[in-house]
């Protein structure tokens, strides 16, 4: 091993992430960089090349971080090794951004020249500043007629405090400005400085399961080197393995003889169980281990919970295995077994938001062929019991009876909404309607305002984002963070079918809205549950008090068609027999509840509740 050669190679490494608000063109810039450096041929090139998950291409968004090694021949005659990590822009996937940044020395801060700095631009920049990264401002979409690069530079300087006078102006669509951007990366992103002679220390920043190779770990080598045949130890679990392959993504896997300090690549080591590693763990040498592990990641708690059940109860174990494999690739997903009287055996899953929940459901259906029933999402409540203890409630059906607790607390968030001046009124009206408390309002410039509200998380996770977009014609952007729990007047509403509570349909609501929500729910269930051969009573109840009711009339068979004589006694006898049969059927008949009904709570927007 020629240390001088390796040190020279290390000096030419540049590790950087691309961060931005959703739809500001991160993936398009990544495409142009790959194209300009001849990393992919013209024949292989396609839009969103690094978004290799089918779901990402369907939705047109980045969901997973993705790394790629690029060789760039610079104007100084040297060849540089770029490790580029593309990141998501949606607030639900900010944990992917923080993991990407931990593997880098620099970050390209991409801002849309037509929209300027948005909520997630700020949030992601602060993550990069916390990691002490070199930040390069990049103004994208300068080819558009409405582009205003000077406005963007002023905003970056005023709102973020970065010098943007020499921000690179580019067009991800046409490739304009990309050569200048590559030169700026060489000049401004520092090379990694890890000690090549130190014991191996590597951070696992992502992982996935391969049916043939087992667990494939995405790693950033902080110190030392690693090659096939080396014995490694996962510091968190103490498990030891022998490395079978190391390499980089370019963008398809390319085997290498070794990875050195500063490299971002992958390794395999016959790790067969998904439980033996986790994202954020440190890998070291089993023979000469390092003393201290790397800091890893702050575990982000779920914000939204939902029940997940296989339509066929025989597939419970398949669902468990699929969730374990998915969790390897999605560190923020949490799940634990739960049982429902209505749906059988399943899992209570924790997500970072509704988009995250949708993505997990779609990935399970597309990648693992699962047929699922999902219950309506809920937040994590705290019930303060009479004895002073706190009970965590992530399933509304688990909330105890009213006499058993003193109060229920719900999570509150600080919501920051960036909005054009013209739409401040509708935004404030929407926030007030969602039980928001006004905090402050900052005028960012003569066109835009940052409105800050304290709001219950439960009001945000349903349809707040959709309503915000529709009331501002798509111009508003939202960022929020949990600030704590507050006692609120909340009640549990049970939905009963023929006097039997359906646990999966229970939900928690503010007392003032409880009756309207229960009425809306019964009306929806009446529409969604098909008619049966017997009458179905739908009721909403708080404890023993019925607060809403609807009835689904049964099918009625004409049992008198055989009577030709018009005998009234015979007719009455047949109808009475039919009535008795239906009554017996109602007592023993099981009402089949379709999947749509379990998601009905989601569809209860304010207009429905107010009966408009």
From Swiss-Prot:
What membrane topology term does the record carry? Peripheral membrane protein
Q: Name one GO biological process term.
A: positive regulation of translation
Q: Where is the tr-type G domain?
A: 11-193
The family database entries (HAMAP family) matched by this protein are listed as:
LepA
One term of GO molecular function: GTPase activity
Please write the reaction equations for the catalytic activity of this protein.
Answer: GTP + H2O = GDP + phosphate + H(+)
User: Which residues are GTP-binding?
Assistant: 23-28, 140-143
EC supergroup of this enzyme: hydrolase
Predominant location:
membrane
Keyword annotations from UniProtKB, A to Z: Cell membrane, GTP-binding, Hydrolase, Membrane, Nucleotide-binding, Protein biosynthesis
Q: Which GO terms describe its cellular component?
A: plasma membrane
Instruction: Show the SUPFAM superfamilies listed in the entry.
Output: EF-G C-terminal domain-like, P-loop containing nucleoside triphosphate hydrolases
Q: State the function annotated in the UniProt record.
A: Required for accurate and efficient protein synthesis under certain stress conditions. May act as a fidelity factor of the translation reaction, by catalyzing a one-codon backward translocation of tRNAs on improperly translocated ribosomes. Back-translocation proceeds from a post-translocation (POST) complex to a pre-translocation (PRE) complex, thus giving elongation factor G a second chance to translocate the tRNAs correctly. Binds to ribosomes in a GTP-dependent manner.
Family stated for the protein in its record: Belongs to the TRAFAC class translation factor GTPase superfamily. Classic translation factor GTPase family. LepA subfamily.
Among Pfam families, the record links this protein to: EFG_C (PF00679), GTP_EFTU (PF00009), GTP_EFTU_D2 (PF03144), LepA_C (PF06421)
> Where can this protein be found?
Cell membrane
Organism whose genome encodes this protein: Lactobacillus johnsonii (strain CNCM I-12250 / La1 / NCC 533)
According to the UniProt entry, what is the EC number of this protein? 3.6.5.n1
- Its protein name is Elongation factor 4
